[in-house]
């Protein structure tokens, strides 16, 4: 029985291995872009195509993957390349109109839907691969950050890694279990383009490989997620939202371009295609148009893999269906998967694969009799299709009962997660033994917070409600108000125009029950006092927000960033919208001057993407908060070095007069390409003793070539300049790969943690820091006294006051940080740490927020503190249990350690943003946690969760 289970796992793994035979963005990346574009589109004027697609998703999904069919199959690389460009769409549209007169038959409709999928694939590859003049597409940026600028390495890892990112962090249940490919029509289109080698047989076989790979990703691709998470933090963090070539951007551009094709298919002149799409018919474009696909994650070429791949393909069910074929997997595959799932409860996958797979693969003769005379070229990653036997059934033949293919394993409770996460059950003690520092285990609390929080949800798909949150007393009544962004808000045809909501607490219908034992739920429209909305598609209005009195009239103003403004002309300049507040209404309530912005600031150069980071702090020692812009993608004298601009608040800020980015009162930029200077910005201290601290998490040392060590640059205030100096006081850099120093940090006066003799403590998170393979990217949060730092310093030489280490791989422990008191009478502040990718199972999890009382692990005794600094022996807090409980935040229970919160909703990114606010006006601060991809009500609609 044990060997049978292993063989079943091998079948699954071999399906996944076929992923490597596919080029371009991975198959399911293309499927996801196409389906997301369908949801983004209004089909205004082309409503029939929306109906066609909705009734033929099996055709649509096959079309979205199709252009990659021949790169490693049948020697059809040139034909596959041809399917990526506008001439193919022109030829296909001409064939459609000549072959299928209106009203279209089912075969005509299927071909039209298939071509919409093909178009999505073509558009997605442009920005993904930086083709046709696009210089900073996703793979280029990934190479610049994670692969020392080596495009080919990034390319392979992005194409395959995106599949595993999707399978792990997203729900693929929508992906069609059956695919239909219009074989005859596609063959005829290629022949009309003078590609005679494309025939029924190789179209059938090559598309079978595409289908097998897609189903492999859907069923079990999540188990390969650690491969890409380890290699590319960039892909994990920015696969969806990277400004040019991320999932959303590729989907928006597909929705921009579909009307051109639909117009052709409705009889409009077949001419130039979409703006983003370069054209081989244009000589200026032609030299840029070869995709040159290569891969690197899964190594092909082994005969055992090839033999087993053939075996899997032989199990596939292929049915003649009109002018095409339908691909499906038999129910026997479902039964095999069920056996594996049942076995999981007894034998975690980590031990099964670790114990048996090496022997199975090393002893190839058990599965494959090697032919000594056979010559095999390991450099050619091509599946030899000649010997694959595929039986094709006729459509009228009785079929098995349709059942959806089961995925591993959104709804299955796997035991012993630590086996996969840490390899060995005793690995927690391994880390303990490695550390020479005092380790304090965290206490767990049995009280269930699930009965004591209120959730407010976003109102439409992909709205990312809760992407940013702020709390400020807008109307001056002494009560905290909430400002919540939803940069993905929009309607089909005009998606991601974005909205920002504000809730004036004394007028809100939201009430949080303190102990009645139920969870309250609201939609944002039920409780919002008002909202401000953008009108530019895909501008991401609300990506970052903040509040200050910009025109010094005594009334707060709302600042809103829209970093993808000017996307429709591929400039991505970005825009800042400033809504001046007023109290001129009869009731004296706070409102904005208008629903339109009072003042705007626009980016100037390509990829400025201003509005990515907004912060407020006093920057000219006049006790008034000023506006700070961080633009990490901006050129800064190179490529994505990043810039920081500061605009002082002033009575000269007048409604109706835009501000030029060149008129900034302060300007700084990064030094190394892709360092992302300005990703985080804080101001420490006050008045003329203040310091500007700018984070560059992707900074790398060009001499050592260690990537993503990160840095924080400190610029002291210069009284003579009435501004921060351009020469740094200190530059602190990381030392290890993926330290990402500068990703997230906060500043606090030492007295809040009981250290009255320390002025400025930096609470610094290193969310991708790892401690060996067993604890890769578990994250760490450290407390540093920065009072005496100067010059160039490596973090390993900095004396730490406290270290808090995460325990869950790739959880992004420290993505968000918050320091504050629950009650004004509390003597010391708490530290809250967000880990939005945290999980407690083999599957993706909900995310989590941890809270600690640092003062209980620090000392106010100057002698002891001095000795700790001399010995470099900070206290280390470490949770070795993997046991996460929720609890009431006001229930101390005498605990000195940490506790945790989560909303128990998978894939929600709970903990992405956190803040404290007395939202229910009871005199105590409430913890407010955003989960910007919460899909429990609507797909990636997002939510905020309010804990009393």
From Swiss-Prot:
Residues that carry a glycan: 39, 78, 148, 300, 433, 452, 506, 535, 749, 788
Enzyme Commission code: 3.1.4.50
Similarity section: Belongs to the GPLD1 family.
Predominant localisation class: secreted
InterPro entries in the cross-refs: FG-GAP, Int_alpha_beta-p, Integrin_alpha, Integrin_alpha_N, PLPC/GPLD1
Domain of life: Eukaryota
GO molecular function: glycosylphosphatidylinositol phospholipase D activity; phospholipase D activity
Species annotation: Dictyostelium discoideum
Catalytic activity: a 6-(alpha-D-glucosaminyl)-1-(1,2-diacyl-sn-glycero-3-phospho)-1D-myo-inositol + H2O = 6-(alpha-D-glucosaminyl)-1D-myo-inositol + a 1,2-diacyl-sn-glycero-3-phosphate + H(+)
Protein name as annotated: Phosphatidylinositol-glycan-specific phospholipase D
Cofactor, free-text remark: Binds Ca(2+).
Keyword terms: Calcium, Glycoprotein, Hydrolase, Repeat, Secreted, Signal
Gene3D superfamilies in the record: Integrin alpha, N-terminal (2.130.10.130)
């Amino acid at each position: 029985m044990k060997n049978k289970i292993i063989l079943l796992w091998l079948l699954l793994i071999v399906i996944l291995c076929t992923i490597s035979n596919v080029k371009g963005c991975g198959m399911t990346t293309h499927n996801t872009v196409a389906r997301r574009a369908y949801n983004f589109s209004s089909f205004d004027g082309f409503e029939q195509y929306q109906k066609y697609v909705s009734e033929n998703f099996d055709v649509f999904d096959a079309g979205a993957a199709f252009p990659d069919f021949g790169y490693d199959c049948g020697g059809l690389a040139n034909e596959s390349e041809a399917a990526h460009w506008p001439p193919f769409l022109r030829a296909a549209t001409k064939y459609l109109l000549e072959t299928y007169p209106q009203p279209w038959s089912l075969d005509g409709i299927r071909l039209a839907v298939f071509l919409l999928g093909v178009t999505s694939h073509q558009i997605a590859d442009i920005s993904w691969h930086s083709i046709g003049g696009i210089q900073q597409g996703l793979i280029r940026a990934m190479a610049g950050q994670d692969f020392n600028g080596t495009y080919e390495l990034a390319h392979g890892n992005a194409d395959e890694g995106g599949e595993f990112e999707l399978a792990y962090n997203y729900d693929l249940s929508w992906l069609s279990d059956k695919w239909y490919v219009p074989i005859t029509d596609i063959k005829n289109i290629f022949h009309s383009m003078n590609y005679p080698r494309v025939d029924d047989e190789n179209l059938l076989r090559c598309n079978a490989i595409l289908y097998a790979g897609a189903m492999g990703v859907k069923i079990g691709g999540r188990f390969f997620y650690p491969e890409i998470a380890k290699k590319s933090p960039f892909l994990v963090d920015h696969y969806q939202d990277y400004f040019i070539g991320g999932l959303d951007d590729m989907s928006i551009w597909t929705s921009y371009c579909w009307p051109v094709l639909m117009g052709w298919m409705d009889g409009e002149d077949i001419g130039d295609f979409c703006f983003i799409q370069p054209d081989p018919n244009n000589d200026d474009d032609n030299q840029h148009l070869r995709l040159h696909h290569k891969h690197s994650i899964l190594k092909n070429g082994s005969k055992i893999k090839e033999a087993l791949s053939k075996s899997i393909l032989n199990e596939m069910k292929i049915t003649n269906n009109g002018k095409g074929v339908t691909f499906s997997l038999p129910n026997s595959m479902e039964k095999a998967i069920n056996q594996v799932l049942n076995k999981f409860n007894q034998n975690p996958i980590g031990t099964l694969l670790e114990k048996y797979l090496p022997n199975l693969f090393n002893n190839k003769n058990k599965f494959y009799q090697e032919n000594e005379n056979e010559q095999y070229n390991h450099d050619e990653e091509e599946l030899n299709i000649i010997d694959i036997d595929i039986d094709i059934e006729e459509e009228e033949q009785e079929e098995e009962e349709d059942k959806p293919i089961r995925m591993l394993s959104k709804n299955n409770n796997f035991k012993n997660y630590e086996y996969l996460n840490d390899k060995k059950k005793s690995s927690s003690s391994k880390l303990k033994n490695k550390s020479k520092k005092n380790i304090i285990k965290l206490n767990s609390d049995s009280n269930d917070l699930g009965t004591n929080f209120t959730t407010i949800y976003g109102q439409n798909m992909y709205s990312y409600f809760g992407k940013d949150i702020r709390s400020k007393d807008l109307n001056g009544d002494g009560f905290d108000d909430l400002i919540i962004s939803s940069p993905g808000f929009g309607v089909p045809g005009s998606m991601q125009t974005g909205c920002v909501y504000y809730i004036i607490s004394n007028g809100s219908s939201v009430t949080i029950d303190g102990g009645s034992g139920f969870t309250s739920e609201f939609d944002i429209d039920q409780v919002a006092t008002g909202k401000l909305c953008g009108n530019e598609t895909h501008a991401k209005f609300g990506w970052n927000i903040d509040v200050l009195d910009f025109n010094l009239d005594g009334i707060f103003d709302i600042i809103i960033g829209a970093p993808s403004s000017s996307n429709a002309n591929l400039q991505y300049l970005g825009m800042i919208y400033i809504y001046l507040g007023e109290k001129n209404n009869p009731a004296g309530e706070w409102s904005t001057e208008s629903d339109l912005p009072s003042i705007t600031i626009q980016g100037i150069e390509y990829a400025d993407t201003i509005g990515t980071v907004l912060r407020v702090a006093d920057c000219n020692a006049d006790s008034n908060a000023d506006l700070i812009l961080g633009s990490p993608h901006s050129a800064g004298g190179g490529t994505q070095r990043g810039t920081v601009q500061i605009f002082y608040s002033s009575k000269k800020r007048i409604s109706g007069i835009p501000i030029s980015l060149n008129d900034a009162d302060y300007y700084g930029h990064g030094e190394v390409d892709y360092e992302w200077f300005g990703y985080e910005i804080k101001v420490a201290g006050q008045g003329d003793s203040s310091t500007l601290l700018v984070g560059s998490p992707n900074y790398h040392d060009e001499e050592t070539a260690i990537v993503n060590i990160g840095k924080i640059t400190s610029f002291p205030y210069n009284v003579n300049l009435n501004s921060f100096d351009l020469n740094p006081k200190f530059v602190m850099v990381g030392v290890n790969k993926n330290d990402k120093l500068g990703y997230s940090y906060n500043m606090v006066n030492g007295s809040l943690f009981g250290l009255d003799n320390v002025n400025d403590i930096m609470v610094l998170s290193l969310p991708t820091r790892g401690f060996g393979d067993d604890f890769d990217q578990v994250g760490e949060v450290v407390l540093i006294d920065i009072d005496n730092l100067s010059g160039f310093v490596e973090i390993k030489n900095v004396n730490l006051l406290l270290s808090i280490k995460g325990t869950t791989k790739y959880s992004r422990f420290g993505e968000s940080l918050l320091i504050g008191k629950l009650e004004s009478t509390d003597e010391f502040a708490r530290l809250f740490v967000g880990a939005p990718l945290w999980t407690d199972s083999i599957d993706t999890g909900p995310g989590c927020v941890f809270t600690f009382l640092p003062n209980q692990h620090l000392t106010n005794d100057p002698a002891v503190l001095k000795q700790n600094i001399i010995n470099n022996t900070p206290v280390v807090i470490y949770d070795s249990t993997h046991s996460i409980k929720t609890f009431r935040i006001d229930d101390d229970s005498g605990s000195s350690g940490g506790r945790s919160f989560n909303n128990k909703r998978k894939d929600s990114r709970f903990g992405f943003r956190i803040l404290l606010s007395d939202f229910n006006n009871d005199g105590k601060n409430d913890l407010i946690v955003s989960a910007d991809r919460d899909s429990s009500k609507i797909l990636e609609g997002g939510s905020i969760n309010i804990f009393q």
